[in-house]
Amino acid sequence: MADEGKEETGMGQVEEDFSVWKKNTPFLYDLLISHPLEWPSLTVHWVPSTPNPYVADSYFGVHKLILGTHTSGSAQDFLMVADVVTPTPNAEPGIGGANQDPFIPKVEIRQRIRVDGEVNRARCMPQKPTLVGAKTSGCEVFLFDYAKHAAKSQTSECDPDLRLVGHDKEGYGLSWSPFKEGYLLSGSQDQKICLWDVSATPQDKVLNAMFVYEGHESAIADVSWHMKNENLFGSAGEDGRLVIWDTRTNQMQHQVKVHEREVNYLSFNPFNEWVLATASSDSTVALFDLRKLNAPLHVMSSHEGEVFQVEWDPNHETVLASSGEDRRLMVWDLNRVGEEQLEIELDAEDGPPELLFSHGGHKAKISDFAWNKNEPWVIASVAEDNSLQVWQMAESIYRDEEDAEDIKEDITQQS
């Protein structure tokens, strides 16, 4: 009975937090789309291609999102492609905000591709955006070219273009090389990292791993290619370790215990070759320099509970975001580390100065989020409450950051 009371109190707090957030949305966001999904999605990913113009209104563009279903065996699972309509940068101020025209379709599921098991993670190949790698609750990684599949599955079976084999258990880690077309990394609970070249010739639509890396002492939570060096990638494990691998030698270059608890995610900075970030179950996000991994450069600890994901902003070198079991998606600006709190801001109660924004629109744990490279400051996030949200914080919140970058650029050009 005591547990039931605690659960009811917890749900009451969730509803109260959501109500406060909803009341403040007109002041916090320049864009906010909230779309209920039939089933929760564990994954969300922007298709890395230029948005198409929206036929009915040139002030809007159509982006594509990759989603999945998590039905827990209650229904057929699908990999999904959705259209998301957002205002273009040329749109008049206010378009897309809280008072956006309700008749403009915001999110529409355009394609459902049948898969075996729920989609743990799905990511598009950067060099061929219609090619999607999907890790499910099975051992195989599926490869689908959604351009070749009908809007609705014509078959009652999962029919991927390729089945990638090499794992013994399911997992979440998945990363396409930004440099080598077709190179796909996967990390799973079997403590293995598999590397495939999907351009290799398969046998009956089945492709074996080109190489299998082993070195972690427990499940691998995430893998990620380095953004500047085509030969390096990193892996994060439930053993608290960060491992940097070199594909030229197929050996570990570094292995360091960076957290006392699980490392759930890692992200290499797309601008600075030495900097990476990790998200951990110890409730922190940590920044590291690859040249000195024995101690973090900086630790951010505003999350309450485990942190499951961290991603650098592809458009701003010092900005990154993180999400955790506290239902919050936090955006950080490292330019503000060490700044004094201003009285006009809500002071230290709002967290450290580098905490730029905290998105509170989900009522349950956030499963995945993604920055939109084509639309600066736009993020898509999905949660266990079946919600998909596409949002952009108000310009007044991040303007200082962009002004600082412009000044820095002017100084560089003049010198």
Curated annotation (Swiss-Prot):
One Pfam family recorded for the sequence: CAF1C_H4-bd
Alphabetical keyword list: Chromatin regulator, Nucleus, Repeat, Repressor, Transcription, Transcription regulation, WD repeat
Major localization class: nucleus
One GO cellular component, as annotated: Cul4-RING E3 ubiquitin ligase complex
Xref: InterPro entries: G-protein_beta_WD-40_rep (IPR020472), Histone-bd_RBBP4-like_N (IPR022052), WD40/YVTN_repeat-like_dom_sf (IPR015943), WD40_repeat_CS (IPR019775), WD40_repeat_dom_sf (IPR036322), WD40_rpt (IPR001680), WD_repeat_RBAP46/RBAP48/MSI1 (IPR050459)
Keyword Transcription regulation listed: yes
Record-level GO BP terms: chromatin organization
WD repeat coordinates: 166-206, 215-255, 258-298, 302-342, 361-401
Chain span(s) of sequence motif DWD box: 232-248
Subcellular location: Nucleus
Recorded family membership: Belongs to the WD repeat RBAP46/RBAP48/MSI1 family.
The protein's role, per its UniProt record: Core histone-binding subunit that may target chromatin assembly factors, chromatin remodeling factors and histone deacetylases to their histone substrates in a manner that is regulated by nucleosomal DNA.
Domain notes: The DWD box is required for interaction with DDB1A.
Designated name of the protein: WD-40 repeat-containing protein MSI2
